Regions:
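Helix-rich effector regions associated with P-loop NTPase G domains
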Residues: 1-26, 34-43, 47-53, 81, ...
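Structural beta-sheet core signal
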Residues: 29, 55-57, 125
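Anionic group-transfer/hydrolysis microenvironments
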Residues: 31-34, 60, 140, 173
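Active-site cofactor/substrate anionic-group-binding motifs, chiefly glycine-
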Residues: 51-61
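Canonical P-loop GTPase G-domain recognition
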Residues: 61-127, 145, 246-247, 253
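Short, structured loop/turn "capping" segments at alpha-beta junctions
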Residues: 107-111, 138, 144-150, 216-220
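Glycine-rich phosphate-binding P-loop
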Residues: 122-142, 146, 172
Length: 281
């Protein structure tokens, strides 16, 4: 199964970001806490190589808490400032401004020595589609100043947001990268909803996900859907279809409906706290 989605507006957005980065002190990179590495656009490291860096692991409420601690330690070891948060409920948001100031303290001190007072830190908010950038900005600013949606690619244009006297944010559209070298990365991005469902084979996606769950989170499927995990994957998904009344007009199990249900339950957190990858220590 090949995963790829790179519409033309992403090329244009990347060029604009390369231009805008000259105005920026800090790059705030949002990642999905369920796939902290796979949801990092590898182009961002090059884009922000001479800037202060902050990684926000969003949707931490949906992720495996132990894995989130491991990933936080992993990124800190790489030299990033890191915060785990849930932008929707504002959990973890209170510390953001203090951490932005801490990350940029050299710049603030440099300004002070040059007699420049109260110049706000200018931060660019970046991330792939559907990691929650707009929701984060709205929660941080306290008003709906960025468009939000649960479909990848809602934020299209450039917009500056003045948060307070200390911080200005530049929101950017979510961009992927032209080619996934590792298709496992594409699989994970598809599972969290960063690739449009319309171009995916949802049946095959569910097979790969169920295979992962049986290996890494045994018992979750049995607990949620009252099915036997001893069954092979196709039988298991068919059993979910029967138990959850995902049936065709003739009363047969509707495999595709059950596959979509399992993926939706993962995305919404109904399956439990799940992280799809671990840091290599």
């Amino acid at each position: 199964m090949n995963f790829q989605w790179y519409p033309g507006h992403m090329t244009k957005a990347k060029r604009q970001m390369q231009e805008d980065i000259k105005l920026i002190d800090l790059v705030i990179e949002l990642v999905d806490a369920r796939i902290p590495l796979s949801s990092r656009n590898p182009d961002i490291d090059e884009l922000g190589k001479n800037k202060y860096r902050l990684i926000l692991m969003n949707k931490a409420d949906l992720a495996d808490k132990e894995r989130t601690r491991e990933w936080s330690a992993f990124f800190k070891e790489k030299g990033f400032f890191v915060v785990s948060l849930d932008a929707r409920s504002k959990s973890g948001m209170k510390s953001i401004t203090d951490i932005v100031m801490e990350a940029c303290k050299e710049k603030i001190e440099r300004d002070r020595k040059r007699g420049i007072k109260n110049r706000p830190v200018r931060a660019m908010v970046v991330g792939i589609p559907n990691v929650g950038k707009s929701t984060f900005i709205n929660s941080y600013a306290g008003k709906a100043c960025a468009k939000t949606g649960n479909k990848p690619g809602v934020t299209k244009g450039k917009q500056w947001i003045r948060l307070n006297k200390s911080v200005e944010l530049l929101d950017t559209p979510g961009i992927l990268w032209p080619k996934f070298e590792d298709q496992t990365v594409g699989l994970r991005l598809a599972l969290i909803g960063s690739i449009k469902d319309e171009i995916l084979n949802v049946d095959e996606l569910a097979v790969q996900f169920v295979k992962f769950l049986k290996a890494e989170y045994p018992g979750l499927l049995a607990q949620r859907y009252e099915v036997s995990e001893e069954n092979d994957i196709i039988e298991l998904i068919s059993a979910v279809a029967v138990n959850r009344k995902c049936l065709s007009k003739g009363g047969e199990p509707d495999y595709s409906k059950a596959a979509a249900l399992i993926i939706d339950d993962f995305r919404s957190g109904k399956l439990g706290h799940i992280t799809l990858e671990r840091p290599e220590i």
